[in-house]
Amino acid sequence: MRAADQPACCRWSRWVVAALLSVLVLSFNGCTTPIRADRTTARAAYRELTKTALDGQCSHDARTVLHRHDLEDQFRKSPVECLRRLHEQACLDDRGDLLYALAELNYLHGERLTRSVKAGDVRAARDFHLAAAIYAWFFLTGQGSAASPDPFDRRFRVACDLYNRAVALGFAEGTRPHTVVRWSRGARALVPGTVRIECREPAGDWTLNDIEKFLPADEYILRGLTVRDRQSGLGAPLIGVGKTIEPRRYGRRVPATLVLRAGGDARAWSAGELVVSLEVYSTYESDSIELDGRTIPLETDTTAPLAYSLNDTTVWRLGTVQFFSPEERIRTD
């Protein structure tokens, strides 16, 4: 049949097919392709390689675990159910990458809840932060048959920071930036299961009864000081604000570190048998802890409490009065 004898609809269909084929050929032969490598600056590439839940993004390591279990879409649509399913996998699979992913994804979901306009979501955020701290502890200490990660593993360094932040946020009360860190004995119902919390009194020249409140040192930027005395390690650095007993007697501001130890594994957690121990250390008394025969340094910050105590302009005025007075006008505990 000649082209002139063909129906108009057939000729039109052929034109459409030819046009579509032309578009496809041009898309593949053009300047962009579906898969490619774009040259960029070293700084931009570093940001892409090192993105984690700590800066509000899902790392490549956590995304790999989600992809392996076909849970990427579910984490976007139903994060709680996704975290529950990943925990079930962690009970069957001792690989450390599952624990790392659970630590990061719980932290990421907790951070998203803190930005919610619903009061219930903000309160629930600390439960996911606590779960993140427990998973990070499992990952760092080696749960089950999984060995502790190599210190050169990038996930090891990120997990330490996740743990330190999540320990404080797991017991935070109030809304940011006015949260205080307050903990007590008892049970906490988390998505994987209930955990029992035990507390240990600090050993040093102050007790918990001497402290009015603890503040997260990580949420303070210091001004007017040349350096910040900070030691890297494990634990949440805190500012302990002492109680003011008399009007002219100022409570001390002391540096402390809160450490969480989890005695058990993911399976014990699912069974409701996980015990979490909270230990608070005075920075002036302890700078490390013992863990399975190893000495682990504590994360400490001695400058933040000092700078915080100088926030009060009254201290500056009284300091001037005290300098020119032969009598003791300022007393501390």
Locations of regions flagged by a protein language model:
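Bacterial N-terminal signal peptides that target proteins for export
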Residues: 3-17
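Flexible, membrane-associating and regulatory peripheral segments of lipid-active enzymes
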Residues: 32-89, 93, 98, 104-333
